[in-house]
Amino acid sequence: MQKKKVLVFLAKAFEIMEFSVFIDVLGWARNDYGHNLFVDTCGFTDIVVSTFNVPVIVDKTIGEINVDEYDALAIPGGFGEFGFYEEAYDERFLKLIKEFNAKGKIIASICSAALPLGKSGVLKNRKATTYHLKNGYWQEKLKEFGVNVVNEPIVVDGNIITSYCPETASNVAFELLKNTDFRRRNGSNKKSYGILRKMLTKLLEVKL
């Protein structure tokens, strides 16, 4: 079975809840259901601090990343008032996004993480969504990047997954798993995916 790798990028002031679902869903899939999926975390610095001051030691810094080693990019959103866009809009990260997209790799974003995708240009003339509260302020910002904004919880356009609030986090992680494990379509895989989704849905107490 071919090994698959997902890169989870953490910008300053990322949301812990949106980060943790990628680790949990892909970790359970690997540990209990035999999916050959592995995760590397990445940031601009060795330690990235979340919105509410939880420090995370990442596996790699952005300068160490070789896009060819990965099958997907996962991006948790974060709070602008805590400095999320200072790093999320950094040209080095925007370049990384463009490299993943140019190679047709899956890119999964949660909530406000769609904004750096928009700024990078990979969503121009494509369908996407982002944080929908605050009277749709951030969705209007996304439109400024030439994005066809859809006011739906999750929007998939080709290789890119976007969502509109933290409540969708687990759904996005499962969508990433479905699209990244990646086109293993045998019956065993479908069964294990269904069991895992049902189990984690109950644990997370979310509606999927």
Set out the residue ranges of the language-model regions:
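Short, thiol/selenol-centered motifs that function as redox-active sites or metal-ligating centers
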Residues: 110-111
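Ser/Thr-centric signal marking residues that sit
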Residues: 129-130, 162
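Short, acidic/turn-prone active-site loops that include or flank metal/cofactor-
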Residues: 132-136
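Extended, subdomain-level signal for the structured scaffold at the beginning of enzyme domains
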Residues: 1-103, 115-122, 141-151, 159-208
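Active-site anion-handling motifs in enzyme catalytic cores
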Residues: 156
